[in-house]
Amino acid sequence: MDSQEVLHDRIGHIVESIVLKKVGPDTQLIATGLVDSLSAVDITLAVEAEFGCSIPAPEIAEHLQSVRSLAAYVAAQR
């Protein structure tokens, strides 16, 4: 596994533990209603704690479109 796959895997586990459903890297989280505002905050806080990054509130919806988009943001912040 390369570092990007590991990142997708770790973020995927965080998302799945909060939404209690299996998600793929490109599963549309917000558009499908899988993630609502409360779970978006939970995911954001968990990702920030796990990876030591900060996701500005106005950008949460943009970066929580999918596991892949969230992983890309986290990777860019490292």
Which residues fall in each region the model found?
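Two-component histidine kinase catalytic core, primarily the HATPase_c
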Residues: 39
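Phosphopantetheine-dependent thiolation modules in NRPS/PKS and related acyl-activating systems
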Residues: 2-35, 43-45, 49-78
